[in-house]
Amino acid sequence: MEENMLRFYRLLNKRLFMAMLIISAIFAFCFSPQFRNIYGLPMHIRVIEGETALFEVNFPLTVSVNHDNASIRVQNHDLLSITALSRPVSLEPVKLGQSTVEFKLFGVIPFRTVQVDVLPPIKLIPGGHSIGVVLRSQGVIVVGNSPVLTMQGQYATPAKDAGIIVGDVIISINGTPVQSETQVAEIIDDSGKNHRNVDILLKRPDGQQHVTATPVLCSETKRYRIGLFVRDSAAGVGTLSFYEPESKIYGALGHIITDSDTNQPIDCEQGKIVLATVSGIQHGKRGHPGEKIGVFIEEDHLLGNITKNSQFGIYGHLNAALPNDKYAQAIPVASMSQVQIGPAEMLTVVDGQTIDQFAIEIQKINLQEAPESKGLVIKVTDPRLIEKTGGIVQGMSGSPIIQNGKIVGAVTHVFVHDPTSGYGCFVDWMLMESGIIPKKERHSARKLFTFSRQFFFD
């Protein structure tokens, strides 16, 4: 009896040990980098015809392409199912279109179905041109409050009392859409003369809101006021990144335009770009970024309009083609997985209107599955540019980055502590913002794939 019980407990302990071992293995797998990477597998990817997308898959996955109208092949074989374990897997486009790639764990457990779009090759004319940017906001932006000295010698703050704060955007007053500082002042003064309050529609990050303010007669201006400073437009100098030669769609700056006082993004109602000339350079140094001193020229001669102010710059249509002495013909774009750490060049203007090529180095690549800024870390290596400007300065935003004869991105920011270094954004995101290629859905930043350098076949 005791021997049977002992045998039973030994068997039970053995089974418990095996169960604990299996549970531990499952937990270890779930918390492993490989599982976290697999969990972040995107549902939708794009490749350009002529590219070979090379992936490092760090787990035993079976990769197969659907049999219907396949536009890609795996590992240089049509309609092939392969099992990848810590070795590269390549997806090679064979024609334009859309395919479905299926991933299975251990070749058995269905895990994810990924849609792959094969896009036509895209060629753009590189920029580098110095441009003047004039952007008019949707509504007017509140940039400050100011007490109003009344006829009774007292200070009143009607706008502040109504809850209006810096950064608010005034969309309309008394139901009338407003577009300029002058229009705002006239409506408020007219309401005050008629002894009426003003109903103000505000736009805020969390939505729209109506507030009511009572205009008071200002003893200094003899006009009715509510004590606000507003701005209806922004202007500055930047750099053209590229344009598409057929449609004349362009991209510039590489980052969003914000109001200088509130740092709030400006909703684009309308805008224009004009030619600008660089008349001087404020040299950049550690802790003090430099700046291009630009002057608008031929303001009546518009280069194009501005239809979008986004996280990745401004976009619109050029009225005519802009010549580029450095690149007279359109050149291909490189998707982010083609970008390599190493030498590259940037195009920008540092004197007059002459576009120059300067050597830089791409030092870090932050591969992104969803649109994010600061995808590239770059460093100026050209002694001519360092001597002239100290490195990257304000006004260089949008300067195209070219590597191996392809546009890979644009300069966006300078490091305050090191003006020879800064950030750039991938051209992928700029093309999506411009509408040249459709946007893809935002996915988790966690990755199944460790993207290796892609090979490109012309």
Task: Describe each region flagged by the PLM.
Residues 13-17, 27-74:
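Solvent-exposed, low-complexity, repeat-rich "mucin-like" stalks and linkers
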Residues 155-169, 192, 391-395:
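A short glycine-leucine-enriched loop at secondary-structure breakpoints
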Residues 2, 14, 24, 33-36, ...:
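Interdomain regulatory linker/hinge segments that flank or connect interaction modules
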